[in-house]
A protein has these predicted regions:
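Pro/Thr/Ser/Gly-rich low-complexity, intrinsically disordered linker/stalk tracts
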Residues: 20-54, 88, 105-122
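Extracellular beta-strand-rich solenoid/capping regions of secreted or surface-exposed proteins
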Residues: 42-43, 193-200, 211-228, 236-254, ...
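Extracellular low-complexity, O-glycosylation-prone stalks/linkers
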Residues: 52-73
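Beta-strand-rich modules
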Residues: 83-102
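Acidic Gly/Asp/Thr-rich repetitive segments characteristic of extracellular carbohydrate-active
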Residues: 158-204
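Right-handed parallel beta-helix
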Residues: 224, 229, 249-260, 278-291, ...
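Extracellular beta-rich repeat passengers
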Residues: 353, 358, 368-544
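Extracellular calcium-associated, cysteine-rich motifs in secreted modular proteins
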Residues: 544-625
């Protein structure tokens, strides 16, 4: 038999030698070699599979096991997908095939995988593409990125390693162009505004450090955007003079400073430092906001939103707002919205103000208003009021830290809960509240029941303790995915925020002052400049004005040599066995052994790996369901 095959092969070889133009028939793709369950909740299943070379996408099919009826057929370009809205306790059957550019060469379906939402336990990742097995990548490379073991356990692709809460699945500019900011101009080629005004998926990186003095509002109107402030050299980037407004879906903003001030023509219209409403899929991470004329950072009416690890301080009280005294922290709310590990310091009020129905276009049926998770935030040195509002809303208040400062009125509560919106007199009912683990330094024994002031606005509306809930209000992803967050005790969260909150890759003196004052219970500056005292300020000049932001301060992002222009500097590519002369490896996934993040995304994480790891240290990572 072996001889016959050999002879046949010889004849074939002679035939081919006579006609070299005959191409061998291409082989069809193989199906994914392995399929596994990477996450499961009561109503969702997340499946992952191994990558197939030359596949342009993957066709997925999910059927019920009991009757074989089809539940979903879809296609994706990645190697993971979540099916939502499933029935708890029902068994489903999943399979996937690799699709080629020529569909005739697409693979057959993989072996079937059966799973039950709420019962099946996710599998350990088989790690088929461990970068440590790649001879070009140094041993132990993946461990150097310090990605949380909890995130590795569920294996989900997040906005970035360390993204948590309602906006954790935001994709931003993933897979898009890299746009370099090369100057500090307000507009024009190489400016931040020009990069933001582009369309399509894009990741904005910075080759410069310093202050961008805006000449008009910076409006983000085109989504699918990642602004990676951590890529700036030295002291980083600060935005001045006008508000930044998020008016698009699918936006990631990280390690930026928004220090508005009272200069220029913005001074009479009640500007916030940064704000956004009525958008979807947004995450604001490790940013610093100050010197607003109205609120420092207001985000409400957004769906699947997260603001995490931010510092908001020193809004301007007796400034140039046309309504007179202001100086507020922010208005916070939305639907599946998370606000965690943030510091609100030195604001007269709105620390925060939880949203109310009349903020929305239809108060009787407000779109994008739902459950809000407010946890592990720290509030220090309010003036007239701390946290209040929430008419008719739904809020978790978990493990937050409150501390009076030199300017603080004695507010003996965690929340001043409103039922009546005073401007219209409409009674929307008190908010529904799940309260647990909150801590007030001056009143350490305060309980959840004691910590709510039911504000009746002189209408004799009685307190409504039935609005205090016994179970957590769930937060879910845009397609019903399970949402996770890290929770510390209130005191530990305060310590973590002061350690790594804000644009802390290189922290400036404004954030240093905010954290020092909050930790010591003091006010570095007692004269606010126009009559305010005790750390509440009226003008930036009262605290020394804007710091200088040098490009020369020690920072791992300082060496900007990037021969192939792919957003990853040569030193990083050389360190991890990539090719500094080939831009194609930016989109590869050789550095993430779990196949979630591109090499470019891993570089963006590399710059802040220690900040992200330090923040979650000592916390408990769990689903918000």
């Amino acid at each position: 038999m072996k001889k016959l095959i050999t002879c046949g092969a010889a004849v074939l070889a002679v035939f081919c030698a006579c006609d070299k133009n005959i191409e061998p028939e291409p082989a069809p793709l193989a199906p994914p070699a392995e399929v596994w369950l990477s996450a499961s909740s009561g109503t969702s299943l997340t499946f992952s599979w191994t990558e197939v070379e030359d596949a342009v996408r993957y066709a997925l099919r999910l059927d019920r096991s009991d009757d074989g009826s089809n539940v979903s057929q879809t296609s994706v370009t990645g190697t993971s997908h979540t099916f939502s809205g499933l029935e708890t306790g029902t068994e489903y059957v999943f399979k996937v095939r690799a699709v080629a550019s020529d569909d005739k060469l697409s693979s057959s379906y993989s072996e079937e995988y059966k799973a039950v939402p709420g019962s099946s336990t996710p599998d350990p990742d088989p790690e088929p593409d461990d970068p440590d097995d790649d001879p070009d990548i140094p041993d132990g490379a993946y461990e150097q990125f310090r990605i949380s073991p909890d995130e590795d356990a569920h294996g989900l692709a997040l906005a970035f390693p360390g993204a948590e809460g309602g906006g954790m699945y935001t994709t931003g500019g993933r897979g898009g162009r890299v746009i370099h900011v090369t100057n500090l101009n307000d507009s024009g080629e190489g400016s931040l505004r020009a990069a933001i005004n582009e369309s399509g998926p894009r990741i904005v990186v910075f080759d410069v450090a310093g202050i961008i003095e805006l000449e008009s509002k910076l409006r983000i109107r085109n989504g699918d955007l990642t602004i990676a402030g951590q890529t700036a050299p030295g002291d980083g980037i600060c935005i001045k003079n006008y508000a930044t407004v998020v008016e698009a879906d699918n936006v990631i903003i990280r390690f930026m400073r928004f220090r508005l001030g009272d200069q220029g023509s913005n001074a009479d219209d009640g500007e916030d430092a940064i704000w956004g409403r009525r958008q979807r899929d947004i995450i604001i991470d490790h940013c610093s906001m100050s010197w607003s004329i109205d609120e420092c950072a207001s985000f409400y009416g957004n769906s699947n939103f997260t603001m995490q690890w931010c510092i908001m301080t020193e809004s301007l009280r007796r400034s140039v707002h046309d309504k007179g005294e202001h100086g507020y922290g922010g208005i916070w709310g939305g639907e599946n919205a998370s606000f965690h590990h943030n510091l609100l310091a030195n604001h007269d009020s709105r620390n925060p103000r939880f949203d109310h129905p009349e903020i929305y276009e239809n108060p009787s049926d407000p779109d994008m208003r739902g459950n809000v998770d407010y946890r592990n935030n720290a509030v220090y040195n309010w003036g007239s009021n701390s946290s209040y509002g929430g008419e008719g809303g739904h809020f978790n208040m978990v493990n937050n830290y409150y501390r009076q400062g030199p300017a603080s009125r004695d507010r003996e509560y965690f929340l001043d809960a409103n039922g009546i919106y005073t401007s219209s007199g409409t009674d929307y009912g008190y908010p529904y509240l799940y309260m647990s683990g909150n801590y007030y330094l001056q009143y350490p024994d305060m309980t959840a029941e004691d910590g709510v002031y039911w504000h009746d606005h002189h209408t004799n509306t009685p307190p409504d303790p039935t609005r205090l809930l016994s179970a957590l209000l769930p937060i879910s992803g845009p397609d019903g995915q399970t949402v996770y967050t890290t929770t510390h005790s209130a005191q530990a969260a305060f310590d973590r925020i002061c350690e790594v909150g804000g644009a802390s890759l290189v922290r400036d003196e404004v954030d240093e002052r905010a954290c020092h004052d909050a930790e010591t219970g003091t006010a570095t500056f007692t004269d606010g400049g126009n009559g305010s005292t005790g750390g509440i300020i009226d003008t930036p000049s009262a605290v020394g004005g804007w710091p200088e932001y040098s490009a020369d301060t020690g920072n791992e992002a300082n060496d900007k040599t990037d021969s192939d222009g792919d957003g990853m500097p040569d030193w990083f590519e050389e360190r991890f066995g990539l090719d500094p002369d080939s831009a194609s490896d930016a989109s590869g996934m050789t550095l993430d052994r779990h196949g979630r993040y591109s090499n470019l995304e891993m570089y963006l994480h590399w710059l802040v790996r220690d900040v992200m790891a330090s923040g979650t240290e000592g916390g408990s990572y769990a689903a918000l369901d």
